[in-house]
């Protein structure tokens, strides 16, 4: 399959803290003369969810692979079955890595690649006569604002259930009032098929306690983990529910001092940090699951609900991370050593989102020195070599013309003047060596 010729977007306006721009829906209806197999190639600058005839077919969550689009643009492929007659492709875009002002401490708000989310897609199939057809991203696609009013990879989401558009991605939906998509410029980065393991939900947790406080209801899930909360509520029209996440308690409430950027914009950031917001439409049971963010937390403070709504069934934690296969483990007669192994593994998986990050609640950055030090024990426990290989490509691409590396990869350009140096550069030696030790890699093909 050839890479799509065109990227499209809803508009050039992108989301900021001061001016919220909703995540866009895009759709394209087309006719097929018989049931047929088809191949889809799709990428996005930002995150995407892909739908065919109303069914979400996305591989995992937070797709595609997170990268600097000036260096690498990753795409995914799908095999699908088209029905005879009308078919509908739907794409929902989130800001992802392309527009994450919540990372302003590392200059992501001023990144050269910062832009509105956009996508490129090509679906190919063969008709009854044997003629090949391609449905491609272009200006014939229709677009409309979704109920996701604000999404930031690091901070959270604001979703308004009153603005949902039932059937937007299904057959027979009238999109005549939607505007046409516009063409976007091609990113500079190399286009590559993603071979790293996808991120997906691996477990569900229910609260071990629910406690009433002056600020709302405190949900304790018993363990520090990473993912999102699925909210299930019978709410009233216009009821606004806020979920504030935290790893520890301070004065009986989730503490944010370890994740709150106390520099410029500190008051603004406190309003958004580690928080998801849902407004109810009030027509029965409503379910909301954040799509384009994740959090590191144990506790969730829920405000805006009644005592009757504050049940154990209100929230379910969806634990997420890269789907790395189990490789090894450790146990012995010493329970302290066993607990250390358990804690280490939990830390590893909750920080592995395509590549090893430093923390799932604040930075979500790929610090190279951290990864170099942790790679030995991670590879003893988990089959992470495919993800490591993909990340090594990004590391090589991040080098400047003098060969210097930033301290974090991917980066906006930050990290060449602080937080780097020999200890961080060692990832180019340490990581390939640990891959050789673990799975006998004798070469790494990295252009």
Give the ranges of each region predicted by the language model.
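Short alpha-helical patches at coil-to-helix transitions and adjacent helical residues
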Residues: 364, 368-371, 421-429
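Conserved small/polar residues in nucleotide/adenosyl-binding loops
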Residues: 442-447
């Amino acid at each position: 399959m050839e890479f799509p010729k065109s990227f499209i977007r809803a508009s050039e306006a992108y989301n900021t803290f001061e001016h919220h721009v909703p995540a866009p829906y895009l759709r394209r209806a087309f006719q097929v003369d018989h049931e047929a197999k088809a191949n889809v190639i799709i990428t996005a600058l930002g995150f995407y969810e892909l739908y065919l005839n109303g069914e979400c077919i996305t591989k995992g969550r937070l797709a595609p692979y997170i990268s600097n689009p000036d260096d690498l643009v990753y795409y995914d492929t799908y095999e699908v079955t088209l029905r005879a007659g009308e078919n509908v492709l739907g794409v929902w875009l989130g800001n992802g890595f392309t527009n994450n002002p919540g990372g302003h401490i590392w200059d992501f708000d001023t990144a050269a690649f910062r832009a509105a989310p956009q996508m490129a897609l090509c679906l190919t199939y063969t008709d009854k006569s044997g003629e090949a057809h391609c449905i491609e991203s272009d200006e014939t696609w229709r677009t409309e604002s979704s109920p996701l009013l604000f999404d930031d990879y690091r901070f959270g989401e604001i979703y308004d259930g009153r603005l949902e558009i039932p059937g937007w991605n299904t057959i027979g939906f009238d999109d005549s009032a939607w505007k046409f998509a516009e063409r976007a410029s091609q990113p500079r980065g190399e286009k590559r098929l993603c071979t790293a393991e996808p991120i997906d939900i691996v477990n569900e947790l229910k609260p071990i306690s629910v406690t009433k406080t002056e600020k709302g209801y405190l949900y304790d899930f018993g363990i520090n983990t990473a993912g999102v909360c699925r909210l299930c509520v019978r709410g009233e029209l216009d009821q606004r529910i806020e979920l504030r996440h935290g790893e520890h308690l301070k004065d009986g409430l989730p503490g944010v001092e370890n994740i709150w950027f106390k520099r410029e914009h500190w008051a603004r950031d406190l309003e958004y940090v580690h928080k998801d917001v849902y407004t109810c439409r009030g027509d029965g049971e409503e379910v909301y699951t954040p799509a384009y963010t994740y959090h590191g937390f144990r506790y969730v403070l829920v405000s805006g609900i009644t005592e009757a709504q504050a049940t154990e069934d209100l929230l379910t934690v969806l634990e997420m991370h890269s789907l790395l296969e189990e490789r090894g483990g450790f146990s012995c007669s010493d329970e302290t050593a066993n607990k250390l192994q358990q804690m280490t593994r939990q830390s590893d998986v909750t920080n592995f989102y395509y590549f090893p990050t430093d923390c799932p609640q604040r930075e979500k950055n790929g610090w190279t020195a951290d990864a170099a030090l942790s790679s030995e024990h991670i590879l003893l426990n988990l089959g992470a070599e495919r993800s490591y290989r993909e990340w090594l490509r990004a590391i090589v691409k991040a080098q400047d013309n003098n060969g210097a590396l930033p301290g974090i990869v991917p980066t906006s350009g930050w990290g060449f003047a602080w937080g780097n140096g020999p200890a961080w550069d060692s990832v180019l030696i340490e990581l390939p060596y640990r891959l050789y030790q673990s799975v006998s890699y004798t070469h790494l093909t990295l252009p």
